[in-house]
Amino acid sequence: MTQEFAVTTPETTQTVGTARVKRGMAEMLKGGVIMDVVTPEQAKIAEDAGAVAVMALERVPADIRAQGGVSRMSDPDMIDGIINAVSIPVMAKARIGHFVEAQILQSLGVDYIDESEVLTPADYTNHIDKWQFTVPFVCGATNLGEALRRITEGAAMIRSKGEAGTGDVSNATTHMRKIRQEIRKLAALPEDELYVAAKELQAPYELVREVAETGKLPVVLFTAGGIATPADAAMMMQLGAEGVFVGSGIFKSGNPAQRAEAIVKATTFYDDPDVLAKVSRGLGEAMVGINVEEIPQPHRLAERGW
């Protein structure tokens, strides 16, 4: 079998990655933890704790939420510092719809780009055309329709959104359960009803039929938003996540290095209560957090994207 790496489009002579390679790169992260870091020192702590990748950004979601204002792509020097500090893959965030930020991140050599609702959207109508890039993209989703639309645009990994920067896992569970529930519902439909389902999901029929036949997304499904403890990570894995993003929950806690290692172990041994109890001991204070229900609707980050 021939291996695909990239293709050059004749119209532009631009090299773009194939879906097989992009999705394969995301597959390599399955079962792991991806941690938000703001300094090279934090990146090293994450790597030493067993993170499969780090997300380089100037402010963790809790600080973005607290400080307000317009949140944009991180400074290239800061991203370079983290890339040079670790040997594991480095992700970075671009604003929804901001294809030039994505072009810059690709030029910097990041391994993955997160088109993220945590940053202030640059376009309230269009997401980035992710097929035009060699680097794979990860995108958030709160339901199956949103996930399928992002995959149609070229996303190689989906993460259920949750509510970033809160330390409240409730929205993460809601979104993961909803995506999984909608997949099961789709798989139970007779084939002639998939056309209507595709219309309702606002997604291509061929992609809807593939999900119905396989019972899963064609890309990796991680979870994110509000995961602050080993138990949170393990619960999300038991609910069907294939890996975990942890943002503010580690470096806003009392003992980041120990908590990072504990969350990695909990993600690996998510179905072993004895291991979970052991790694949950003596972690110190978790991030204080915010109850999602107390956040006004306009300030909920998960509402961004469509």
Curated annotation (Swiss-Prot):
It catalyses: aldehydo-D-ribose 5-phosphate + D-glyceraldehyde 3-phosphate + L-glutamine = pyridoxal 5'-phosphate + L-glutamate + phosphate + 3 H2O + H(+). D-ribose 5-phosphate binds at D36, G165, G226, G247, S248. Pathway: Cofactor biosynthesis; pyridoxal 5'-phosphate biosynthesis. This is Pyridoxal 5'-phosphate synthase subunit PdxS. PANTHER family: PYRIDOXAL 5'-PHOSPHATE SYNTHASE SUBUNIT SNZ1-RELATED (PTHR31829:SF0). The active site is at K93. It holds the Pfam family SOR_SNZ. D-glyceraldehyde 3-phosphate binds at R177. Keywords: Lyase, Pyridoxal phosphate, Schiff base. It comes from the Bacteria.
